[in-house]
Amino acid sequence: MDFIKQYDWAGLITNAGVLLIKLAIMILLYFIVRSLGMKIIKHLFAKFEEQNSLSIGRAHTLRSLTLNIFAYTLIFIFFVMVLDLFHYDPSALLAGAGIVGLAVGFGAQGLVSDIVTGFFILLEKQLDVGDYITVSTFDGIVEQVGLRTTQIRSFDGTLHYIPNRNITNVSNHSRGTMQALVDIKVPAERNIDEMIHILQQVCDETAAALPQIKEGPNVIGIQELGTSEIVIRVIAKTENMEQWRVERVLRKEIKNAFDRAFPKETE
């Protein structure tokens, strides 16, 4: 009881109060610096986009990575400052981390592999945010490239998180022009030259109407020859991600042209 009475409770409460105030200020500064840093990074990359220094997809990819690096670095600095506030030597922690690192090194190989692979993906410009890609059994639009994972959203809305180390083969469908391909089945008894002429007329009209078409469309010729029907192939080169739209328009216009050229007999 004498110990309790003699203990400097006022000093303890004062020191604890000062410590809590300092901690609150540090937390407040952390969120202020984080908010300002995020805004500055986003503003800088927006400027790059306006000046056409970077493509939109490339700018979004690098912005996402820069934001991740900034966030992780800021958390580390905040953690070290908190340790220092409680009079714990951060260097001792870092020295201990080296020993612990040896123990968990094998377990961390995957993390290191993710980061290194992600770095080379960005360095070699294999993909950008907004690209349509196929990775292994997944395909979709790249939403984010991070330090550890790449996020791909499939066309059904599913968001896939793929560890960067698993991205060994990438098929990027958003680089350069893409090919629109339409196969048209027609009865074998029809005059082939007449059918090709009608199809090419549709192709020429569609090319004039759609600026997304970069070359063609052109009737390549007979793709398959059967006893009751033949298949005629039409091919066009389009802007990336526009090939499906061009194919749909071609099918619609070809159907309309056939309806006009070969009206059904009325009873």
Swiss-Prot record:
GO terms for molecular function: mechanosensitive monoatomic ion channel activity. InterPro entries: LSM_dom_sf, MS_channel_1st, MS_channel_C, MscS_beta-dom_sf, MscS_channel_2nd, MscS_channel_C_sf, MscS_channel_TM-2, YbiO_bact. GO terms for cellular component: plasma membrane. It is a multi-pass membrane protein. The chain crosses the membrane at residues 13-33, 66-86, 101-123. It is found in: Cell membrane. Induction: Expression is sigma B-dependent. Induced by high salt concentrations. SUPFAM superfamilies: Mechanosensitive channel protein MscS (YggB), C-terminal domain, Mechanosensitive channel protein MscS (YggB), transmembrane region, Sm-like ribonucleoproteins. The keyword Nucleus does not apply. Disruption phenotype: Cells lacking this gene grow normally in minimal medium or in high-osmolarity environments, and exhibit the same survival capacity as the wild-type strain upon a drastic osmotic downshift. They sporulate and germinate normally. Combination with an MscL mutation enhances the osmosensitivity of MscL mutants subsequent to a hypo-osmotic shock. Keywords: Cell membrane, Membrane, Transmembrane, Transmembrane helix. May play a role in resistance to osmotic downshock. Belongs to the MscS (TC 1.A.23) family. This is Uncharacterized MscS family protein YkuT.
